[in-house]
Amino acid sequence: MTHFSPREIVSELDRFIVGQTDAKRAVSIALRNRWRRQQLTGSMREEVLPKNILMIGPTGVGKTEIARRLAKLANAPFIKVEATKFTEVGYVGRDVEQIVRDLVEVAIGQTRERKRKDVQARAQLAAEERVLDALVGANASAATRDSFRRKLRAGDLNDKEIEIETQSSGGAPMFEIPGMPGAQVGAISIGDIFGKMGGRTKTRRLTVVDSYEILVNEESDKLLDSDQLTQEAIAAVENNGIVFLDEIDKICVRDGRSGGDVSREGVQRDLLPLIEGTTVSTKHGAVKTDHILFIASGAFHIAKPSDLLPELQGRLPIRVELDALTRNDMRRILTEPEASLIKQYVALMQTEGVTLDITDDAIDALADIAVAVNSTVENIGARRLQTVMERVLDDISFSAPDRNGETVRIDAGYVQKHIGDLAKNADLSRFIL
C-alpha cells in the first residue's frame, strides 16, 4: 500500500495528466485515507468507512487516465471495470459480484509476486540445480556438476538448449452447469473440483537463459504457503481494495422510460449492497466489501447524476466535476506529459532514422484545429489530438522507411497544408476527423 502524501500523489499524477486538479485532489485524499485508517486500532478502524467518489466530466478529459495512473501508484489491489458489462443477477451475463472475484485474483497475483521476492535466493539455487540436472544428468559426479555450475554462472551456457519438465500453464477444462446464474459462476473448472492431484506437467525444449525464469517462478511457488498467501490477499482486498467503475452514466435510466432494465437499473440495484458493504463468496473464501473504495466515473452527457438511483447517489458522497479542455490544455497535453503525443511520434520516427522537428507554431496550430473540430462536430476531448496528429503525419509515417537520415520540419504551414481545409469543411471533418 502506498505511503505517499496527497501532495506527492497529485504531483505524480501531474506527470501524466494535464489539469483536473479537483479530481486529483479527491483521489489523493481517498488514497491517503486508506493509510490513515490502517494506523487506527480496535473498533475505530472498523467504523471508518471509505468515502466513495463520483467523477463527472465530458469524454476525453482524463477520468480513465486518472484510474490507470492511480492503479500503478496505489500498490494495492486495484481493478477497473466498465459498468456496461454487467447484467442483473439471474440473467445471462456477468453479475456485479464478479468484480470482487476478479479483484481477489488481482490481489493473489500481487501477493505472490511480492512473496516470490522473499524466497528468490533459495528459488534461484533450486532452479540452478534443475538446469544442471538437465545439462549433465542427476547422477553426474560432484566435480562435473561444479565445472558446469561455474560455466552456467559465467553465462557460457546461456544459448545451449535443454529439455525441462514444467507445470502446464494451460487451464483445466471448463464445463457449464445449466441453470447457474452468470457465465462466470456457471463455468466450473475441473481443476477446482479435483484439486491439484499430481499437477499436469509437460516437457519443453528451451535455451538455458529462457528456462531460468520459468524454473525460478516454479521453485518460488513451491516454497510459498498457498493458504497463507490467499488469506493475505483477501485481507488486502478487504482493507485496501480499490474498484474503478467506469461508464456508470450508461446504466442510468433516463426520464420517460418505464419498467426496470436488466442491464441498467437492475445493475444499479445489485451495486447497492456491494458498495454499502456485503459478503461475497469466492472460490478462495468469503470477502467483505465494507472497506473497498469505489470510484465511479461517467460523462453524463445524456443522463444526469440525478438519474442514478437515489440510494446509489447516497453511496457516492464525494462528487468531483472535471473541466472540459481549453485550447491551452490541448497545447499542454501535446508537450508536457512524460509520454506526450509529440514525444511518442518523435520517438517512433527516430526508429526509422527520421528526425521530426516540430515547431511551437505547429503545436499551436494542432491545438487550434483540435479545439475547432471538437466545437463543430462532437467534443471528444484530448482523443481528438490523436486523430489530428495521425492525419498530419500520415505522409511521413508512410514514407519514413525511404527517408532514413532526413530531418523533417513541421511548422504551422505544414499543418495547415495537410489538415487545414479538412478541418474547415464541417461535413468532411464529421466523417474523417
From Swiss-Prot:
Please report any disulfide bonds recorded for this protein chain, giving both cysteine positions.
none
Question: What's the short name of a Pfam family annotated to this entry?
Answer: AAA_2
Q: Which UniProt keywords apply?
A: ATP-binding, Chaperone, Cytoplasm, Nucleotide-binding, Stress response
Task: Name one molecular function that GO assigns to this entry.
Answer: proteasome-activating activity
Keyword Iron-sulfur among UniProt keywords: no
Gene Ontology cellular-component annotations: HslUV protease complex
GO BP annotations listed: protein unfolding; proteolysis involved in protein catabolic process
Transport in keyword set: no
Q: Which InterPro entries match?
A: AAA+_ATPase (IPR003593), ATP-dep_Clp_protease_ClpX (IPR050052), ATPase_AAA_core (IPR003959), Clp_ATPase_C (IPR019489), HslU (IPR004491), P-loop_NTPase (IPR027417)
Q: Which residues bind ATP?
A: 18, 60-65, 246, 311, 383
* Alphabetical list of SUPFAM superfamilies matching this protein: P-loop containing nucleoside triphosphate hydrolases (SSF52540)
Its subcellular locations are: Cytoplasm
Q: Which family does it belong to?
A: Belongs to the ClpX chaperone family. HslU subfamily.
Complex formation: A double ring-shaped homohexamer of HslV is capped on each side by a ring-shaped HslU homohexamer. The assembly of the HslU/HslV complex is dependent on binding of ATP.
Task of the protein: ATPase subunit of a proteasome-like degradation complex; this subunit has chaperone activity. The binding of ATP and its subsequent hydrolysis by HslU are essential for unfolding of protein substrates subsequently hydrolyzed by HslV. HslU recognizes the N-terminal part of its protein substrates and unfolds these before they are guided to HslV for hydrolysis.
Q: Which NCBIfam families match?
A: hslU (TIGR00390), PRK05201.1 (NF003544)
Q: What is this protein called?
A: ATP-dependent protease ATPase subunit HslU
Gene that encodes it = hslU
